[in-house]
Amino acid sequence: MPWEKGAVAFGGFVAFFSSDLSFGVEGSGTGQLNAEDLLGLDSDLTVFRVGAMYRPGKSRRNQLDFSYASYDRDGNATLTEDITIDNVTYPVGAQVKSVFDFDIIRGTYSYAFWQNDSVRVALGLGIYAVPLRYELDIETTGGNTVVEGADTTLPLPALALRGEFRLVNRLFLNAAVEGMYLELNDFQGSLLDLNVGVEYRPWKHLGVGLGYNFMGVNVEGTGSNSDYPGVDFVGEVDVRFSGLFLYGKLSF
């Protein structure tokens, strides 16, 4: 059977971002602010990613897996247009320091309903924990103002579909998609996580891989007393990033 019992993978991911942030009560500002163009955040970032997988039982149809990556960015910019947040207008020329940090921590259980020596396809359920922090420090002629967005951790449940295909001996094609949409009281959230890549296993316990990942996350809080865990802010985050990742893999 070509499907591993367990594995640990680690490597680098070069991500390219498009992010929009909003602060405060809906209708009291200019709407979403582009974090890269207007607020000076880097549009690309190289991060370390780690993941682990284990398949209990002899059939190896059940699978538990985990992954982690941290995306921390800060920027400096001079406003090129007026922005309004909570009915306060900050003029062209104001100096803005921005912080936008988040982690993606994912755990998933899946079951392979189709598995043979060449193909493995599984369905599952996952949970994403997303520690999130974003804020602005705006300097005008009148002084400094710190505008807080959020500093919280959001749990996002997701459905998962996984596929592994043995192309030739030791060469595999892997694909996975996880997604969710949820609207509850003062919270609305959506997530799409798409991965596809090739993996070469020249030795029994060692492999290397190259893949592509796209991820889009949108979370919006409209009240500080929501029933949804972690929603203690008023604002919206809409972040999309994609890029290539290269990794090594230890299997057992």
Predicted features along the sequence, with ranges:
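Residues on the lipid-exposed face of transmembrane beta-strands in outer-membrane beta-barrel proteins
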Residues: 10-12, 50-54, 107-111, 125-127, ...
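Repeated loop/turn-to-beta-strand initiation elements of outer-membrane beta-barrel proteins
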Residues: 60-64, 117-119, 169-173, 205-208
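Solvent-exposed loop/turn segments connecting transmembrane beta-strands
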Residues: 117, 180-191
